[in-house]
Amino acid sequence: MRTSYLLLFTLCLLLSEMASGGNFLTGLGHRSDHYNCVSSGGQCLYSACPIFTKIQGTCYGGKAKCCK
């Protein structure tokens, strides 16, 4: 009996997540902006980019700059 309640609860959670835009479900498999920056040879900085580097994007959800 507990198993059926658990399955029903899980199904309701998934359906409510899909109805609200599916941020959790669509976010699976996406790389973070920090990962993309560092893997392309950049570094994430909250301050200005060092000399001889330029801004290539953002990190931490737009709170920092990706300098390369």
Curated annotation (Swiss-Prot):
One of its GO terms (molecular function) is CCR6 chemokine receptor binding. Has bactericidal activity. May act as a ligand for C-C chemokine receptor CCR6. Positively regulates the sperm motility and bactericidal activity in a CCR6-dependent manner. Binds to CCR6 and triggers Ca2+ mobilization in the sperm which is important for its motility. This is Beta-defensin 1. It is found in: Secreted; Membrane. InterPro entries: Defensin_beta-like (IPR001855). The keyword Membrane applies. It comes from Pan troglodytes (Chimpanzee). Keywords: Antibiotic, Antimicrobial, Defensin, Disulfide bond, Membrane, Secreted, Signal. Belongs to the beta-defensin family. The gene is DEFB1. Gene3D superfamilies: Antimicrobial Peptide, Beta-defensin 2, Chain A.
